[in-house]
Curated annotation (Swiss-Prot):
Tissue specificity as recorded in UniProt: Ubiquitous.
Name of the molecule in the record: Transmembrane 9 superfamily member 1
Predominant location: membrane
Keywords per UniProt: Endosome, Golgi apparatus, Membrane, Signal, Transmembrane, Transmembrane helix
Residues that span the membrane, as ranges: 223-243, 294-314, 322-342, 365-385, 396-416, 449-469, 482-502, 519-539, 551-571
Segments on the Cytoplasmic face: 244-293, 343-364, 417-448, 503-518, 572-589
Cellular compartments annotated: Endosome membrane; Golgi apparatus membrane
Notes on the domains: The C-terminal KXD/E motif functions as a Golgi retention signal, certainly through the binding to the COP1 coatomer.
Encoding gene (name): TMN1
Keyword Cytoplasm: no
Motif (Golgi retention signal): 587-589
Length: 589
């Protein structure tokens, strides 16, 4: 007992340590007059390559004296490629600062080359003051008739305007001037100034200035929601027609008691379609362990996405650096019980015997896929010396969360699912000899049904994908989680409806291999999203270089894997309910 109690305490402390930096930061700090306000320098990098970021002092700016003070902002902040360092610039609350020298900068050939390379790559930097971001460019290229490439100039003065309401900082803005040409052997002073301006804006509304209302609340966004909603109405109507009309007629003919031999023979000769495969439709799927694992994982991801969206709506997670990532990781660990429960129940109902394999695969499939992609990307980031490289300590924390929270919960869920919901309950008995599957037209084959099944679900989220991609890859803050919730619900409904229709046509073609077909029919949505990401990369961005290209397609691959597993599980579970419903009332031998 003591050991289990100690483990519970350790887990609790771990979760507290992860969540506290995100939700209890300096953002609610109240300052006294002339109290020191810290300006944190964060990162620099090419503007067109959002993930290619480096330590601010990787450029030859003059560094603070002594040991650099770092700010730990939580797991999500580190995974987001942030490293906040105290600039040690003297800024005091409500005290204006005229032009003052930060430090003298002596230029040599190496420093000039470094700055010129950064300017040619449109390097930008990011600072933070009281958890509010400031951005600026390192320098710029001025046209020069004596030079083909133009004249490289470095901004040497930073003017910081701070708006405050009583004892709280509301808004910060950075402007730069005094551009100086970069020439080896010269010396220039890096200077700054601070201006404090009172404002009536409340602390609760201070982040509004960073939200792009015209972009996210454009009429095309509303139109896409309406269009997807109409698609839901159409598809639910189609499924209802199948259930209420076609199947009702089939039931009436199949269940009719008729003593007339001639009529009975005629009915038998006319009988075809889904009714003929009732003795095979509940035959266990091939690779049952894998199917159970992906369906369980997909059910967990569906619940996870719903929880994170709701928490983002209630808690405005977009305000905190890395808050979404931290919330996602912690919620993933805590919802791992769901994946085990769904997987274990499904595997038991299908008569599975390899329980250890099922438990381990369910608990580790998606995390290890992400770890594999992340390891490759991390290797690239380490080679480039980028802040995107995950520190070893952070890797240990993530592994501890998985090993001591997620993995045990998934195992527990599998055991509970096996014992509580694992009793076989098939409406029809499975025949000993499998029925041969007749040849059908090409468009009724499982591969075609699977590939076509993702088109309509992709169409329902197509516009939202543009807003999500633009937020992640083009420096916009995504805050319309109400839209995302609507789109997610629409995606689930459309996926279920499309998969049910595909399953019905497949069974009517006397093909009883519906389990994997229903999964891939829904999962193929992710294929279309990945194809769209390729279009987005070449048409909507100006990314370049091996580093950014690797991260773009690597992150997109992770996202599409999760989306595919989620949609596949939703499609399978919907089809499973449909199949059990239509075979429940027919007379099985």
């Amino acid at each position: 007992m003591p050991s289990s109690s100690s483990a519970a305490v350790l887990v609790f402390l771990l979760l507290v340590s992860l969540l506290t930096p995100t939700f209890a930061s300096d953002s609610d700090h109240k300052y006294q007059a002339e109290e020191q306000v810290t300006l944190w320098v964060n990162k620099v990098g090419p503007y067109n390559n959002p993930q290619e970021t480096y330590n601010y002092y990787s450029l030859p700016f003059c560094r603070p004296s002594g040991n650099n003070v770092h700010k730990w902002g939580g797991l999500g902040e580190v995974l987001g490629g942030n490293e906040l360092i105290d600039s040690e610039i003297a800024i005091k609350f409500m005290k204006n600062v005229e032009r003052s020298v930060i430090c003298p900068l002596e230029l040599d050939e190496a420093k000039v080359k470094h700055f010129k390379d950064a300017i040619e790559s449109s390097y930008w930097f990011e600072f933070f003051m009281d958890d509010l971001p400031l951005w600026g460019f390192v320098g710029e290229l001025h046209p020069d008739k004596n030079s083909e490439n133009g004249k490289h100039v470095l901004y040497t003065h930073k003017n910081i305007v701070v708006k405050y309401n009583k004892d709280q900082i509301i808004h910060v803005n950075l402007t730069q001037d005094n551009p100086r040409p970069l020439e080896a052997g010269k010396k220039m002073d890096l200077t700054y100034s601070v201006q404090w301006i009172p404002t009536n804006v409340t602390f609760a509304r201070r982040f509004d200035v960073y939200l792009d209302y015209p972009f996210f609340e454009h009429q095309i966004h509303w139109f896409s929601i309406f269009n997807s909603f109409m698609m839901v109405i159409f598809l639910t109507g189609l499924v209802s027609m199948i259930l209420m009309r076609t199947l009702r007629n089939d039931y009436a003919k199949y269940a009719r008691e008729d003593d007339d031999l001639e009529s009975l023979e005629r009915d038998v000769s006319e009988e075809s379609g889904w009714k003929l495969v009732h003795g095979d439709v509940f035959r266990p799927a091939s690779s049952l362990v894998l199917l159970s694992a992906v369906v369980g994982t997909g059910a967990q991801l569906a619940l996870l996405v719903l929880l994170v969206i709701l928490m983002a709506i209630v808690g405005t997670l977009y305000v905190g650096r890395g808050a979404i990532v931290t919330t996602f990781i912690v919620c993933y660990a805590l919802t791992s019980f769901v994946s085990g429960y769904v997987s274990g129940g499904m595997y038991s109902r299908s008569g599975g015997k390899h329980w250890i394999k099922c438990m381990v695969l369910t608990a580790s499939l998606f995390p290890f896929l992400c770890f594999g992609i992340g390891f490759l990307l991390n290797t690239i980031a380490i080679f480039y010396g980028s802040l995107a490289a995950i520190p070893f300590g952070t890797m240990v924390v993530v592994f501890v969360i998985w090993g001591f929270i997620s993995f045990p919960l998934a195992l527990l869920g599998t055991v509970v699912g096996r014992n509580w919901s694992g009793a076989p309950n098939n409406p029809c008995r499975v025949k000993t000899i499998p029925r041969p599957i007749p040849e059908k037209k090409w468009y009724l084959t499982p591969s075609v049904v699977s590939l076509m099944g993702g088109l309509l679900p992709f169409g329902s989220i197509f516009i939202e994908m543009y807003f999500v991609f633009t937020s992640f890859w083009n420096y916009k803050v995504y805050y319309v989680y109400g839209f995302m919730l609507l789109v997610f619900v629409i995606l689930v409904i459309v996926t279920v409806c499309v998969t049910i229709v595909g399953t019905y046509f497949l069974l009517n073609a006397e093909n009883y291999h519906w389990q994997w077909t229903s999964f891939f029919s829904a999962a193929s949505t992710a294929v279309y999203v990945y194809l769209y990401s390729i279009y987005y990369y070449y048409v909507k961005t100006k990314m370049s270089g091996f580093f950014q290209t690797s991260f773009y397609f690597g992150y997109t691959m992770m996202f599409c894997l999760g989306l595919g597993i989620l949609c596949g599980a939703v499609g399978y579970l919907g089809s499973n309910l449909f199949v059990r419903r239509i075979y429940r009332n027919i007379k099985c031998d």
